[in-house]
A protein has these predicted regions:
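An N-terminal, well-structured beta->alpha segment
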Residues: 2-41
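Short, structured loop/turn "capping" segments at alpha-beta junctions
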Residues: 142, 172-182, 190-195, 215
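Glycine-rich phosphate-binding loops that contact phosphosugars or nucleotide phosphates
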Residues: 41-48, 52-160, 166-169
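Bateman/CBS regulatory modules and CBS-like beta-alpha motifs in cytosolic regions of diverse proteins
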Residues: 188-219
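Short acidic active-site motifs
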Residues: 28-32, 77-81, 216-217
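Short, flexible loop segments at the rims of nucleotide/cofactor-binding pockets, characterized by
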Residues: 19-25, 68-71, 94-97, 205-209
């Protein structure tokens, strides 16, 4: 196949993976949204490798849309970062296999700390899924990688599950453009949402006549 055919096949596989996931969205998704909405703590996202990279994006999306959240690397967690975890925090653990050792090692602490655990995995019968209070299924029929090794369709499914949670929480909270502007004061979004006429208008305008000399203009 040429590069265009490969690209089209990859997109087809990943779209089919998302449709497969869509058909299985159910009560546990509603439960996850409800628990996150009602918590008085933060939402801590955790994952290794590609799952961790996707987790960072999910945490950033949560934080910028009214859900206090941050990413915690499981390796760093074992070297002091667990001190940031409060009992009222919700812990979202991401692992496609549900057997990532670095993530599983956190379970005893989380249970002892009485944290509510949401697992995002592609295997409902995995150790992580079975030890979570709520499980979000991101299983896909196959990866786009021809060798079924590189995370592709599964990471896309994880990302979209995170987006679905983010938007569902925005809807549940009635998150408005004004709320969005509060968290995005910089960049083009901030300027578009927050700029007022008084910020751009000035009283002292440098007015010169058409017959003024260049020396007068620059002075």
């Amino acid at each position: 196949m040429n590069a265009i055919n490969v690209a089209q096949e990859v997109i087809d596989i990943e779209v089919n993976g998302l449709l497969y996931m869509k058909d299985r969205i159910g009560n546990e998704f509603e439960l996850a949204v409800s628990k996150i909405q009602d918590t008085t703590g933060r939402v801590i996202i955790c994952g290794m490798g590609k799952s961790g990279i996707i987790g960072k994006k999910i945490a950033a999306s949560f934080a910028s849309t009214g859900t206090p959240s941050f990413f915690m690397h499981p390796g760093e967690a074992f070297h002091g970062d667990l001190g940031m975890v409060k009992p009222e925090d919700i812990f979202v653990a991401i692992s496609n296999s549900g057997e990532t050792d670095e993530v599983l090692k956190l379970l005893p602490f989380l249970k002892d700390n009485q944290n509510y655990i949401i697992a995002i995995t592609g295997k409902r019968e995995s150790t992580l899924a079975k030890n979570a209070h709520c499980h979000l299924d991101i299983a896909v029929p196959k990866e786009a990688c021809p060798h079924q090794l590189a995370p592709t369709a599964s990471t896309t499914a994880t990302l979209v599950m995170g987006d679905a949670l983010t938007v569902a929480l925005m809807d549940a909270r009635g998150f408005s453009p004004e709320s969005f502007a509060r968290f995005h004061p910089g960049g083009s979004l901030g300027r578009r949402l927050l700029s007022k006429v008084r910020d751009e208008m000035h009283c002292k305008l440098p007015i010169v006549s058409t017959d003024a000399s260049f020396t007068d203009v620059v002075s």
